[in-house]
């Protein structure tokens, strides 16, 4: 049985991915790293909180970014690479955790303790969830889903070889509306525990 477990979880906006991730992390008794906790750690390294929030899983401004070898003058790229280094360090420390987004499935693709998940959903189910959670009209919710997913996709595809949401990049992809939030979390927990027990 593996003594360390690292779960990377990508998600479509409105799929309930964060809610499901929280249930999984609490059941397994491991740390959840999401936008807020990652921002907090990077801010402690000297980056401004406003800058981090502005660049959170946003696409790179190609006109403002120039790369020289492994180095870049782009703040977006530097913040992203700092995030990836932090993720690798946590994995190398032996810590078990669940990471939401941040190209986790690619950053840790060679780690034998990593299991990668992607949560999507039926468009109507996602629309209803965003409308209810945010108090938006259908038109506003459609635009929010389109914008957020476009930003996540552009961010991910800039840094990763495999495309965002491509099932081949993940160990398991699911639609949360098929079993519901709790049912999806329970199924994924069983999958993760089976992965842990596998030599």
Task: Please identify what each model-predicted range represents.
Residues 8-22:
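Glycine-rich phosphate-binding P-loop
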Residues 31-43:
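Short beta-strand-centered segment that lines the nucleotide-binding/catalytic pocket of NTP-utilizing
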Residues 42-96:
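ATP-dependent small-molecule kinase phosphotransfer cores
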Residues 60-66, 77, 138-182:
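Small-molecule kinase domains that catalyze NTP-dependent phosphoryl transfer to phosphate-bearing small molecules
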Residues 84, 181-189:
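Short, amphipathic alpha-helical "lid/cap" segments that border enzyme active or binding sites
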Residues 110-133, 138-146:
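Conserved phosphate-donor/acceptor-positioning beta-strand/loop module used by diverse small-molecule
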């Amino acid at each position: 049985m593996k003594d360390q477990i690292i779960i990377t979880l990508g998600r479509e906006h409105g799929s309930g991915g964060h809610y499901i991730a929280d249930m999984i992390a609490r059941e397994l008794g491991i740390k959840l790293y999401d936008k807020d906790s990652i921002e907090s750690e990077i801010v402690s390294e000297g980056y401004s909180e406003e800058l981090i929030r502005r660049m959170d899983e946003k696409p790179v401004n190609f006109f403002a970014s120039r790369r020289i070898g492994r180095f870049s003058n782009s703040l977006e790229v530097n913040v992203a690479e700092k995030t990836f280094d932090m993720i690798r360090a946590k994995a190398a420390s032996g810590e078990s955790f669940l990471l939401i987004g941040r190209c986790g499935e690619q950053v840790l693709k060679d780690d034998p303790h990593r299991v990668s998940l992607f949560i999507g959903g039926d468009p109507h189910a996602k629309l209803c969830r965003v409308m209810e959670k945010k108090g938006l009209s259908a038109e506003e919710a459609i635009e929010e889903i389109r914008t957020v997913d476009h930003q996540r996709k552009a961010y991910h595809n800039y840094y990763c070889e495999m495309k965002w949401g491509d099932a081949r990049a993940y160990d398991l992809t699911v639609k949360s509306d098929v079993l519901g939030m709790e049912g999806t979390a329970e199924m994924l927990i069983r999958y993760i525990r089976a992965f842990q027990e596998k030599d």
